A protein has these predicted regions:
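Short cysteine clusters
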Residues: 127
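Cys-dependent protein tyrosine phosphatase-like superfamily
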Residues: 17-123, 136-195
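Sec-dependent N-terminal signal peptides
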Residues: 5-14
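Substrate/cofactor-recognition hotspot
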Residues: 130
Length: 195
């Protein structure tokens, strides 16, 4: 084989292995607003924030944002919030979700807690990376409380700058009209028992 043919084949192989960077998503002005890239911290609305697991040095930022409650979705290492913020007046709630097995009832419970605690101030929800479980809760919040279209909420979760991991197919598959109806029914039950 001539050197030119070998060179051409090598060059072609290298080009074939490269990927074209995808264009950034469009029409995203209604998505959560970046507050701090370091903490993957975003503002969803005036009383709701999302982030990764925060550390003690984030306390001043939480105070500045008037965050009164942190909802921790982590199943493992659940005490990190207590170690970082246990000395503060921030209300710490632990509602662990197993990434690979999430039920509509669990999501309804978390959304209920978020809504109840928003009466006292802003709420921050997080998991370890602030991407997958957090994304599922934020997308569900968007659909249930903000009346977003299911596909748009899912698009924000998957394509937003939060670090979503597409390996969690069960999270992708969670977003059905049936599951959203189950969440709404569970929330309606809770509303009726507190009246």
């Amino acid at each position: 084989m001539s050197k030119n043919v070998l060179f051409a084949l090598t060059a072609f192989s290298l080009v074939a292995c490269t990927t074209t960077p995808s264009e950034p998503p469009k029409n995203t002005e209604h998505w959560a607003t970046l507050i701090s890239k370091q903490e993957n911290l975003h503002q969803v609305d005036n009383k709701f924030y999302r982030s990764e697991q925060l550390e003690a040095q984030s306390e001043a930022l939480l105070n500045k944002l008037n965050i009164h409650t942190i909802v921790n979705l982590r199943f493992f290492d659940r005490n990190d919030d207590k170690q970082a913020f246990g000395h503060t007046k921030i209300n710490l709630i632990n509602t662990p979700l197993l990434t690979w097995s999430i039920s509509p009832e669990e999501v309804a419970d978390i959304l209920w807690q978020i809504k109840q605690h928003q009466k006292n101030g802003a709420v921050l929800v997080h998991c370890y990376h602030g991407a997958d479980r957090t994304g599922l809760i934020v997308a569900s919040y968007r659909v249930i409380y903000q009346n977003w279209d299911l596909n748009e909420a899912k698009r924000e979760m998957q394509q937003g700058p939060y670090g979503y991991h597409s390996v969690w197919k069960n999270i992708d598959n969670f977003f059905t009209q049936e599951n959203m109806a189950k969440i709404k029914a569970e929330l309606d039950k809770r509303s009726n028992t507190t009246k």
